[in-house]
């Protein structure tokens, strides 16, 4: 247990931040799963509509410090790469 006033305050702050971070990461996870599911079902037009929401959630988390900027860039790049692979596969077949 915390002994000082400042330590008690830090516990409160860290708990508040943990909840905020979990909400942000949960949004990213939700939209990412939705996007990947649409790609698997070959609903590319719908996936294109969901992608900006995923990218927005990732960018907000990176801006607020929940995600490192390189991690955010890697996640966005991966999603774009998957979409482009599906698009090129559909065009070639």
From Swiss-Prot:
Keywords: Ribonucleoprotein, Ribosomal protein, RNA-binding, rRNA-binding
Record flagged with keyword Protease: no
UniProt GO BP: translation
Signal peptide range in chain numbering: none
InterPro entries associated with the record: Ribosomal_bS20 (IPR002583), Ribosomal_bS20_sf (IPR036510)
GO MF, one example: small ribosomal subunit rRNA binding
GO cellular component terms attached to this protein's record: cytosol; small ribosomal subunit
Its biological purpose: Binds directly to 16S ribosomal RNA.
Family: Belongs to the bacterial ribosomal protein bS20 family.
Entry-linked PANTHER family: 30S RIBOSOMAL PROTEIN S20, SMALL RIBOSOMAL SUBUNIT PROTEIN BS20C
Name by which UniProt lists this protein: Small ribosomal subunit protein bS20
């Amino acid at each position: 247990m915390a002994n000082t006033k400042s330590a008690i305050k830090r516990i409160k702050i860290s708990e508040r931040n943990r909840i905020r971070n979990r909400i942000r990461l949960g949004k990213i996870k939700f939209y990412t799963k939705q996007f990947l599911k649409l790609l698997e079902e070959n609903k590319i037009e719908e996936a294109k509509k969901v992608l900006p929401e995923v990218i927005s959630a990732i960018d907000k988390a990176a801006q607020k410090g929940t995600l490192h900027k390189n991690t955010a860039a890697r996640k966005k790049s991966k999603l774009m790469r998957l979409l482009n692979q599906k698009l090129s596969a559909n065009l070639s077949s």
